[in-house]
């Protein structure tokens, strides 16, 4: 029961990050209007997020605040009508005070984002089930062709699904040849099909 109680963020490694502001560490008390969930429950105390939401560590404060504003006023939406947590995010953003928004923005901006997704090229992937917006391998179910998908799964399903472990990484299964195609796109625009990513992003 405690593992599913999102009143308080699971902070297994408090030494990995600065002290969390109240809005990052705890949701508002029941009965307080409006109800606001804690930022760290979904995006984790280190801001790395998970496949069902987003990594927000290291985002500039101004950009962070603009995204909150866009979520809150309805300017930012999702292309997937079945993605329920977008509505949760929009409601949270709309209900934040300016003080809470700035505290969260400054906190996550102070944390450096580090890689925790490993790309693995493959022809087959584990059969999976959806667990609240991300995919978890089904034990004993075997594999299936990857096709043209990119499939992200946790390295340790129990650590991610049950304990929300912010140190437990993810595997991104991709079709064979994807990494070279990605490099070509970044460095040369995909054989001239478009602008190289490095032209803007370095």
Listing of model-derived features with the role each one plays in the protein:
Residues 57-86:
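Extended intrinsically disordered, low-complexity coil regions enriched in Ser, Thr, Gly, Ala
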Residues 1-37, 41, 76-187, 192-198:
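Flexible coil segments in periplasmic/lumen-exposed cytochrome c-class electron-transfer proteins
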Residues 48-49, 63:
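Primarily extracytoplasmic ectodomains and periplasmic/lumenal surface modules that are beta-strand-rich
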Residues 201:
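Carbohydrate-interacting regions of secretory-pathway proteins
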């Amino acid at each position: 029961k405690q593992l599913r109680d999102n009143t308080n963020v699971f902070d297994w490694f408090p030494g990995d990050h600065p002290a969390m502001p109240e809005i990052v560490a705890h949701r508002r008390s029941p009965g307080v209007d409006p109800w606001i969930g804690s930022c760290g429950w979904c995006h984790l105390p280190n801001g790395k997020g998970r496949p069902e939401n987003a990594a927000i560590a290291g985002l500039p404060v101004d950009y962070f605040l603009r995204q909150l504003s866009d979520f809150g006023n309805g300017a930012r939406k999702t292309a997937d009508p079945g993605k329920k947590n977008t509505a949760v995010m929009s409601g949270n953003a709309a209900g934040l005070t300016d003080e809470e928004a700035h505290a969260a923005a400054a906190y996550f901006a102070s944390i450096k984002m580090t890689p925790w997704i490993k790309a693995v090229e493959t022809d087959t992937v584990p059969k999976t089930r959806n667990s609240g917006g991300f995919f978890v391998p089904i034990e004993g179910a075997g594999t299936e062709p990857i096709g043209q998908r990119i499939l992200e799964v946790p390295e340790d399903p129990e650590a991610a699904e049950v304990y929300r472990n912010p140190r437990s990484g993810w595997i991104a299964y991709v079709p064979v040849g994807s990494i070279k195609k990605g490099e070509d796109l970044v460095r040369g625009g995909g054989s001239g099909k478009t602008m190289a990513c490095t032209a803007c992003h370095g």
